[in-house]
Amino acid sequence: MLKKLFTVSILFFLTACSREVTNYPNAKYKITDKEVKKYILELNNREQCIYPQLAELSYEEAEAQVYSKQSDAEKKTWDYMSNRLLSEIIGDNYAFLEQDEDSANYFIEKHNRLNNQKAKVDPKACALFKEDFESFLEGAKGCECSK
């Protein structure tokens, strides 16, 4: 009996400690850790390119000092830029995230689990991104369309 309890306990422990997202077995597309890590690193680089002060802030501080103060145009621009980046990384699979709720939730859960990478901002890439960001932001400011 004790041996059975020990075996069940070990199995439960290993299952509980699994790093894989298992809540969405019917997801049509399951983004890989490698893809999510690449997305997080690139997005963090781009955010810190535009908002260098993010490098020293916790998420709560960043929310209070940066994200909560973004204009609607800035939010729209970040939505566009982050979606475009994800589409560049996963290609045609991006359609699954738009159309399949389980695939989208799988991505969100995996993103939340892996989002702890530090940015490594490349000055040349940053300059190019800033131009792109500013250009789209100007267009978003002039748009009276819904979010």
Stretch-by-stretch model annotation:
Residues 4-5, 113:
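N-terminal cationic leader/targeting segments used for protein routing and processing
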